[in-house]
């Protein structure tokens, strides 16, 4: 398994997906910077302690990172089949189940890594203004959010791949998925079942009751179960080709 994960990571050196992800992260930082320091008239919201860190995290989760993660995940899972090298791999032979699981682990690493890169960039800005008042809890918010968003978008990745659709559709689906969060988030306690709202809840972005946290955990578990079923079907389908 470790060899397969390492192999998948080495394949990324030939991929432009990392550049796409970097562009998306830069856009998030630019937009939040403009909003926090230039769009508030006489009041610069970015000067408030931890405003920039929480603004980058919330804007990224609502509009950019789910789409980036979904696009990346769909690309690396269906890359072999769309580039017509899957049949060659099956001649080696390769354990398709382990290969798909290795790809999923790489997606998890990418999701968490993307959030950590975003955190470090935002943290550097905050350090310039509020080094004395920053707390460790904000790092936890980013870390948990990265893990939860991975589980939230994994069903989209698996569904797009299992249906043999173009991986760019996962970007579109994830963006719609993210946009709906704006409206679902106002529905009260029941909104915690929506995966991206659940991600905000579990990371501590929202103040939540034990019942809301429980609903968020259930949401993540359901995402994991649905993804597990799709991954199993995907590995069996590819093994029969």
Summary of predicted features, one role per range:
Residues 1-25, 162-165:
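Aromatic- and glycine-rich beta-strand/loop motifs that create alpha-glucan
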Residues 26-69, 101-167, 203-207, 211, ...:
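Secretory targeting signals
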Residues 20-25, 164-182:
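Pore- or pathway-lining transmembrane helices of multi-pass membrane proteins that form conduits
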Residues 77, 86-89, 121, 125, ...:
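Hydrophobic alpha-helical interface/terminus motif in multipass membrane transporters
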Residues 34-53, 171-241:
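Terminal transmembrane helical anchor/hairpin motif
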Residues 67-81, 157-168, 223-236:
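Transmembrane alpha-helical segments in integral membrane proteins
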Residues 76-108:
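Helix-loop-helix units of permease transmembrane domains in multi-pass membrane transporters
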């Amino acid at each position: 398994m470790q060899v397969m994960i390492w192999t998948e990571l080495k394949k990324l050196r030939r991929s432009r997906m990392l550049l796409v992800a970097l562009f998306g992260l830069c856009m998030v930082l630019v937009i939040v910077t403009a909003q926090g320091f230039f769009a508030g008239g006489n009041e610069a919201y970015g000067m408030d302690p931890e405003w920039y860190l929480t603004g980058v995290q919330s804007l990224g989760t609502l509009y950019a990172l789910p789409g980036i993660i979904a696009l990346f995940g769909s690309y690396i899972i269906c890359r072999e089949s769309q580039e017509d090298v899957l049949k060659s791999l099956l001649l080696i032979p390769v354990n398709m189940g382990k290969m798909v699981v290795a790809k999923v682990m790489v997606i998890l690493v990418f999701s968490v890594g993307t959030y950590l890169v975003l955190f470090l960039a935002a943290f550097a800005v905050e350090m310039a203004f509020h080094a004395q008042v920053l707390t460790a809890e904000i790092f936890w918010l980013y870390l948990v959010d990265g893990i939860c968003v991975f589980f939230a978008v994994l069903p989209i990745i698996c569904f797009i791949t299992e249906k043999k659709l173009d991986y760019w559709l996962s970007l579109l689906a994830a963006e719609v998925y993210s946009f709906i969060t704006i409206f679902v988030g106002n529905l009260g306690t029941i909104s915690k079942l929506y995966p991206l709202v659940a991600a905000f809840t579990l990371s501590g972005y929202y103040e939540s009751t034990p019942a809301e946290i429980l609903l968020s955990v259930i949401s993540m578990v359901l995402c994991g179960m649905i993804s597990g079923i799709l991954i199993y079907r995907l590995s069996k389908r590819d093994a029969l080709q």
